[in-house]
């Protein structure tokens, strides 16, 4: 039976690699298939409730993408080193949750190049490919290094971003497809320019800790978009709790409507009413 309406706490969009990416919206206990709603009128209404995605308590404000303030201050997944992995302090025995750190940070990470709104460098756990690329709305992506820990991947990223961006311009992302980039050539250029720095990191952590991926292939990703927005305007459910319009596309964590665009991940843990007409 086709989805008509529902209400619940939301999580980030789930995107499965396909031609194009196949999206769904976690809404309470259900997952709303989104691709089939392209061209339909959808309505999202913030119901004035936010429940922490970790402990479930009600909170007036969302911290660290869906947490309450107490959880934000105590969870390792909300620490500053998640945003700045080179600042990892696990080896100082000050990790908020050492067991969590063992599982999520002391594991193989991939340093990659992507083309979203232009060339950028990024990192992710090896198990999060291609999810990370889809979440960022990348049209092309290429793994370039396999690194032993999150901290080490952050140090490599810090080295490479001296010559390439590490951020995505969301407006450019939603205005259209980026011009294709020769990611293999960019990989060779960037790694060549960072050779001395990479060798220093290998000397510090061991040769096997930072390994190039010369045989990796470029992944092309296509998104379900009927029409891009020439001048994307971002919806703010905090100020205007109702957003309604024709769904024209889905890219990264954004829904593109003819009235505005909305970053769904920004509203993680918000209770929304979602309907289709």
Please provide the spans of the model-predicted regions:
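Non-catalytic accessory segments flanking enzymatic or RNA/DNA-binding domains
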Residues: 1-277
